[in-house]
A protein has these predicted regions:
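C-terminal non-catalytic regions of proteins with extracellular/luminal or membrane-system context
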Residues: 2-169
Length: 169
């Protein structure tokens, strides 16, 4: 398994009220190593050949969210490019989204094997996420929120005051 992305070796969290420094944090890399007990290689910025040669690629991506920060609905351009490159290089791609809110996945959602929306997992949530990835547990439940397919589906669409330099593409 090739684990890639800026959050392959760290536990992401948002700012403001969602910023809680835990103890004994479990990273995506540590969680997958524990769940698989097999060869897991973590590379933040892989090249095309590394992606192509991997049996399975897991892209750990997402956004940074906090109160009083307006961010685009899109992922960071570098993260978006990594997902697209992984899809071009390999047929077995899992995208692990670690975020505090929705993102635009329309450019690649139909090109990946799976999407796991892990939100901000907390200090040990990555272990449960890894158990989902390896089939140890079957996730179920209902969300208290809606993840929009595009920003136009958001109740906030069209309500941003004129003059603000915010992109929602």
């Amino acid at each position: 398994v090739l684990l890639v992305g800026r959050w392959a070796k760290t536990v992401p969290q948002g700012g403001g009220a969602s910023c809680v420094r835990g103890f004994n944090l479990v990273t995506p890399e540590q969680a997958l190593l524990s769940a698989l007990r097999a060869n897991v290689k973590a590379v933040e910025k892989p090249n095309f050949i590394q992606l192509q040669k991997a049996d399975i690629v897991v892209v750990a991506t997402g956004t940074y969210d906090s109160e009083n920060i307006e961010r685009p609905f899109a992922m960071d351009e570098e993260d978006e490019a990594l997902v697209r490159m992984a899809c071009a290089a390999n047929k077995k791609v899992i995208v692990l989204v670690l975020s505090g809110s929705g993102i635009d996945m329309s450019a690649w959602h139909d090109k990946v094997s799976a999407i796991i929306y892990g939100w901000y997992p907390g200090q040990a949530g990555m272990q449960a996420t890894a158990d989902i990835m390896v089939g140890k547990i079957n996730p179920s439940g209902k969300l208290p929120a809606t993840i929009e397919k595009s920003f136009k589906d958001s109740p906030a669409y069209g309500m941003i005051p004129a003059g603000l330099n915010i992109s929602h593409t």
